[in-house]
Amino acid sequence: MEKQLPRGCKIIEFPLAVDDRGALSFAEGARHIPFQIERVFWIYDVPEGKTRGGHSHCETAEVVIPLNGSFTITVDDGRHSAEVRMESSGKGILIPQGVWCHLHDFAPGTICLVFASHPYDASGYINDYSEYLNEQLSVVRYDLSRQTEWDSFVRISKNGTFLLERGYMDYHAARFTDCSLMFYKKGNLIAMLPANWKEEEGTVQSHGGLTYGGLIVSPSMVAINVLEVFSCAIDWMKRELGAHRWLYKPIPYIYSSIPAEEDLYALFRSGAVLKERGISSVIDCSNRLPMRQSRKSGCVKAAKSGLRIEQGNMTSHLEAFWNILAGILNEKHGKNPVHTVSELQLLHSRFPENIKLFVALKEESVEAGALIYDTGKVVHTQYLASSEYGKRNGALDLLLRNLIDDVYSDRTYFDFGVSTEDGGAFLNEGLIFQKEGFGARSIVYDTYEMLF
C-alpha cells in the first residue's frame, strides 16, 4: 500500500497489546510519530455526507488516526492521488507538509485523532485546489528551445560549472539520447538534471558523458525541496521512459559556491547504493601542504635543462601534446584520449577562458603539457602528459608548480583528477603518489545506483 501512496505519505502501525481485558494501542513520541508533536485535536460527530480537510499545509505534517469508527482519506501531491480507508485504531497515516488531503465517508460514531507538528496557524493552509496545483513541482524535458534558459541557470546555481552548460554537454550529443530535466515551481526554474537515456539497459545516466552530472540547484534550494525533486524525477523516469535504473554522479563539493549536498541525502532516502568511487587529489590553496623534496628536485632539474613554461596555442602545441598523451595511453591501455584534437579545439572556441593548454618547451618542442579546465573556484587538470625527455628532466614538476604557485594561485582548489580505474577497484599508486607530492590530498568522485 505504501508504495502507491503520494510523496511522503506512510501508514504507521502502532504497538498493540491484546488480552482478555481488551486491546491497547499507544504512541511514544519520536518512536512512533516522525515529528515533535506541537498540537493534538480530534474530530467527531461528523454529519452524514459531510467532509473534513480539503486543504494542504504549508509547514505542518500530521498523523491521522481513527480512534473509533472509520473514514476514507484522499491524499494527493499533485502528481499522484490515493484513497485509503482508515478503520483500525491501531493504524494511522502520515500526511507530510505540502500534501493535499480530505476526509470523507465517515461512519456513524467515528472519532478521528490528529497529531500535528506545528500549532494552529490560519495562514498556513492552502484551501483552493487550483492554487495548490499551481504551487506543485512540475518537470519538463530539455530541448534546444530552452538552451539559453538552461545555461543562464547553470551560471547562477550554487553548484553548476561550465561543463554543465549546453555548449559543453552537447559537443558529443550524437553519442547520447538526451533526457535532461528541468524542474519548475510557481513558474520558476529551481533545479535541472543533466541526463541521458540508455533504452537497451532501461537506465538513466546523469550523466554518461561527463565526469559529474548531478542535480544543478538554485541557491535557495533546501533539503526538502531536493527530496521533492528526486521523487518527481523518479516518477517521470518510470512514467515517460519506463526506466528501472538511475546512475547518478554527484557534483563534488569543491565545485559548489555554497554547501549543496542535499542530493546525497536524497540518494540515501531513495535507496541508492554506491556503485563506483574514484579518488582524486586536490590542493586546498588556502591551506597548502609543502611539496615533497622529490617534486622540488624535479623543478630544479627542469630549470637547469632549459625547459620553459608558457601558455600553449590550441593548434600546433595542442597537436604535439595530444600525440604525447595518445602515445602514453595507447601503450598502457590500448586506447586514445576521450577527446580528439578537433573536439578540444571546438570546446576551447566555446569556452576560451575556461579551457587552456600550458606546455613545457625545450626550445620549440613540447615536452610536457597540462590541459586545464578552470571553473573559477576550481582548476582541474583534465589531461597531463610528458615526453620521455620531459620525464627525465622534471618537466611536469616545473609546469605544475608554475600553475599552482603563479597562474592559478588565487583559486580555491587545484584538482589533479582521479588516479583510479575500473570504477575505483584499481588505484594507480605511482600516479597518486606523484600528485600527493605537490601537497594534494583526496576527495572522491562517486557514482550511485538507484533501482526502481
Feature annotation, model-predicted:
Residues 1-93, 108-111, 115-137:
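Non-catalytic, conserved peripheral segments adjacent to functional cores
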Residues 109, 176-178, 241-243, 355, ...:
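Short, high-confidence coil segments that cap the C-terminus of an alpha-helix
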Residues 124, 255-274, 421-442:
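Conserved active-site alpha-helix within GNAT-family acetyltransferase domains
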Residues 140-202, 250-390:
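A conserved beta-strand-loop-helix scaffold within acyl/acetyltransferase catalytic domains
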Residues 184, 193, 228-232, 353-452:
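Aromatic (often tryptophan-rich) hydrophobic motifs at membrane interfaces
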Residues 203-220, 377-388, 417:
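Conserved acetyl-CoA binding element of GNAT-fold acetyltransferases
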Residues 210-259:
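A gly/proline- and charged-residue-enriched helix-loop-helix capping module
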